[in-house]
Curated annotation (Swiss-Prot):
Protein's gene: yegP
Keywords linked to the UniProt accession: Repeat
InterPro entries documented for this protein: DUF1508, UPF0339_domain, YegP-like_sf
Source taxonomy: Bacteria, Pseudomonadati, Pseudomonadota, Gammaproteobacteria, Enterobacterales
Matching SUPFAM superfamilies: YegP-like
Protein name: UPF0339 protein YegP
Protein family per UniProt: Belongs to the UPF0339 family. Duplicated subfamily.
Database matches in Pfam families: DUF1508
Sequence repeats: 10-58, 61-109
Source domain of life: Bacteria
PANTHER family xrefs: PTHR40606, UPF0339 PROTEIN YEGP
Length: 110
């Protein structure tokens, strides 16, 4: 099964989206947006930037866990991954975002 985006609204009226892999696992989480339209633009940005290797910023947290940020051409963070135990599992996560990030399916939960 192909991946999809889920768009949601928080209790304080902010919006965010997550990218889900075909197995339902969240593989990318957006920043908070003040409007639904801005969150939808963020989804469009994932679609255009996720296939490009140079858009992935690989990081190590202070606790030694590995994660990545997907960035737009203007270097703004579009979304962040979960924490991974190994650098190799982070690479698998990046591959999953590349494979699922162009999905046209959006489940609107707002």
């Amino acid at each position: 099964m192909a991946g999809w985006f889920e768009l949601s609204k928080s209790s304080d009226n902010q919006f965010r989206f997550v990218l889900k892999a075909g197995n339902g696992e969240t593989i990318l989480t957006s920043e908070l947006y003040t409007s639904k339209a801005s969150a939808e633009k963020g989804i469009a940005s994932v679609r255009s930037n996720s296939p490009q290797e140079e858009r992935y910023e690989k990081k190590t947290a202070s606790n030694g866990k590995f994660y990545f940020n997907l960035k737009a051409a203007n270097h703004q963070i579009i979304g962040s991954s979960q924490m991974y135990a190994t650098a190799q599992s982070r690479e698998t996560g990046i591959a999953s975002v590349k494979a699922n990030g162009t999905s046209q399916t959006v489940k609107d939960n707002t």
